[in-house]
Amino acid sequence: GAYKLRDGQSNALFQIIAKNIYHGRYKATGVFSHPTAGDRAIDRVKDFVTVGPRAVKGELGDLGGSGYFMVLTVNADNSVTIDPSGVTPALKTDYQPNYYDPATKTFFLKYSYNTAAPRIVTEQIKLK
């Protein structure tokens, strides 16, 4: 469409953001294991948004409402690097290989935070 600048203005700044192939709405299923409260099921819809050419940001476990987020970066071999975002502390991510399956458009993840009393999350996150 046509855009009109205010009288006396001669410049405009636009931000154009491209989405990567991992950007979208996902269904997450899995388990959040708390050291004292026990296990609880993860069964929810999550939105992951582009933050880089091969990276998306979304809710960590079921804690997005508390400000816990993660950045998933899909590497050339489809392994996934998980980095903390928001209020999320350092993550332990070496329980198993974390990876993305391009055939099913699914992330397979296992990670935890709080090394003294780990909160361990195991989840599959599939594009809807």
Question: What do the predicted segments below correspond to?
Answer:
Residues 2-9:
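Beta-sandwich strand segments
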Residues 11-128:
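Ser/Thr/Gly/Pro-rich, low-complexity flexible regions
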